[in-house]
Structures are given as C-alpha cells and as structure tokens.
Amino acid sequence: MQIRQSVKLKKPLIHYITNPISINDCANMILAAGAKPIMAEHPLEVSEITSVSKSLGVNLGNITDNKMKSMLISGKTAYENKIPQVIDLVGVGCSKLRLDYARKFISECHPNVIKGNMSEIKAIYGIKSSAKGIDVGACDIITEQNFDENIKMIKRLSMETGSVVAATGVVDIISNGTHTYIISNGCEVLSMITGTGCMLTGIIASYISSGNILEGTALAIVLMGICGELSQHVKGTGSFRNELIDNIFSISDDIIIKKIRINSY
C-alpha cells in the first residue's frame, strides 16, 4: 500500500495518450488515484510533455496517424529518460495496423508494462487469437484447462520483451518472467461499460511512476477489481461508472487488504 500512499502524497504528473471514447473517464480515474493527468497528443509537443512527466501511458484505442506519431515520440522520450511507461494493446487482436504498430512500439520504446486481454496478449506473442473486436474472444478466455499454457506464454513474452506483462480478464495474470501474480478480484459489470480497461491503464501509469513496476501494476489491477466489486450494487451501468470512480478515490487500505484475492505462481 506504500505505492498508493506515495502517489497520493506526491501527486505525480502522468502523461496519458488515449482515445476520445474514454479520455475524460481516464483523466478522472488518474485524479481519483491521487495523480495528475495530462492528455497531450500533438506530435510537436508530446516529447516536451513526456520529459517532465513521471510516467507515460499509451493506448491504441481509436488509433489515428497523429497519435501513432505522438505515441512513438513519447515512448522514445520516456525510454531515453528512464520514465516508466505502459502500453495498452487495445484492438491488436482484430487489427493488423495496430498489431504491427504495437510490435514496433515495443521494439523501439521498450515499455515497462505491456497490458491487454488474452486475445491481445496472444496476438502480440504471435499466436492466432479469436478476438471479438476489442474484446477477448470466447476461445481465448483463461480456463482451468488452458491456465498453465497461458502462464507459460505470458512469462515467455515478459522475458523476451523485458516488460512486465499484464493479461487482464476474469482472472488477471501479471508477470515479469520470474515472479507471477494471479488476481481473482473483479466483477462482470466492469466489462459492460466502455473504457474500464483504459481507466485501469491510467491507474497502472500512476502507480508505476514510483519505479516499482511489477507491484505497481499488480496493485492497480487489484484496486480496480475490488472497486468494481464494491460498485456493482447500483441499479445500472451509468451509476456503476460513477460509483467506480468514487470507490477508487475513497477506498481504504484496510478494505483492500480484507478483499484482495492474489496468489503467487
């Protein structure tokens, strides 16, 4: 919990290049986590913005030519200045453009965290996936039958890229190739509103700003899962969205410790 309290105390500046579908919610989620968001995406200013930020998040949702330029510029700036960064592989399972770009970004910018659902993680690894648009395909969902196989793939991807790999879903798997965490928090409603994955990436970017990459990523995923559970009592998805942001802002460490479901593998 030290990471969480440090972010709230220091209020680090987080540069997050994301999509217009979720940008407002992402900025508010970063604020709720205790950090300060800046969502600059113009190619002529992003290097300057990234260089004064404490971490960088890039999100491949609703990709455009300008954002492709900007994310690569920011990613290289972050790498050169040892600024932690996370890439969210939105849609790489259904778009060759995004898949090719993500591979280029990973190769040239060396992000500290690679995040995606299992369809996206399989695609970036080079295995055929069954992505349903930007959502995970039914055949790619983690089950008891494919659990060990998926763990091995995630660990190999982490070791090959040098990045922490975060595969999110009904069960979340986070690995740096040596240490692996399995997280079982969360609820179905998180998948029923747009942008929760993008919001999570904003929290990951906030928490890895401390430099503690594996634990910061795991804590962000735990926090989103628990707050989803706490928010699902509301009458609908609109209320859920607001309740989710409120819970990220107000949840106590004691509740997190009580409700956390995490195991090492």
Curated annotation (Swiss-Prot):
<feature type="binding site">
    <location>
        <position position="195"/>
    </location>
    <ligand>
        <name>substrate</name>
    </ligand>
</feature>
<comment type="similarity">
    <text>Belongs to the Thz kinase family.</text>
</comment>
<comment type="pathway">
    <text>Cofactor biosynthesis; thiamine diphosphate biosynthesis; 4-methyl-5-(2-phosphoethyl)-thiazole from 5-(2-hydroxyethyl)-4-methylthiazole: step 1/1.</text>
</comment>
<keyword id="KW-0418">Kinase</keyword>
<dbReference type="GO" id="GO:0005524">
    <property type="term" value="F:ATP binding"/>
</dbReference>
<dbReference type="GO" id="GO:0009228">
    <property type="term" value="P:thiamine biosynthetic process"/>
</dbReference>
<comment type="function">
    <text>Catalyzes the phosphorylation of the hydroxyl group of 4-methyl-5-beta-hydroxyethylthiazole (THZ).</text>
</comment>
<dbReference type="GO" id="GO:0004417">
    <property type="term" value="F:hydroxyethylthiazole kinase activity"/>
</dbReference>
<keyword id="KW-0784">Thiamine biosynthesis</keyword>
<feature type="binding site">
    <location>
        <position position="39"/>
    </location>
    <ligand>
        <name>substrate</name>
    </ligand>
</feature>
<dbReference type="InterPro" id="IPR000417">
    <property type="entry name" value="Hyethyz_kinase"/>
</dbReference>
<dbReference type="GO" id="GO:0009229">
    <property type="term" value="P:thiamine diphosphate biosynthetic process"/>
</dbReference>
<keyword id="KW-0067">ATP-binding</keyword>
<protein>
    <recommendedName>
        <fullName>Hydroxyethylthiazole kinase 2</fullName>
        <ecNumber>2.7.1.50</ecNumber>
    </recommendedName>
</protein>
<keyword id="KW-0460">Magnesium</keyword>
<feature type="binding site">
    <location>
        <position position="115"/>
    </location>
    <ligand>
        <name>ATP</name>
    </ligand>
</feature>
<dbReference type="GO" id="GO:0000287">
    <property type="term" value="F:magnesium ion binding"/>
</dbReference>
<keyword id="KW-0479">Metal-binding</keyword>
<dbReference type="InterPro" id="IPR029056">
    <property type="entry name" value="Ribokinase-like"/>
</dbReference>
<dbReference type="Pfam" id="PF02110">
    <property type="entry name" value="HK"/>
</dbReference>
<feature type="binding site">
    <location>
        <position position="168"/>
    </location>
    <ligand>
        <name>ATP</name>
    </ligand>
</feature>
<keyword id="KW-0808">Transferase</keyword>
<keyword id="KW-0547">Nucleotide-binding</keyword>
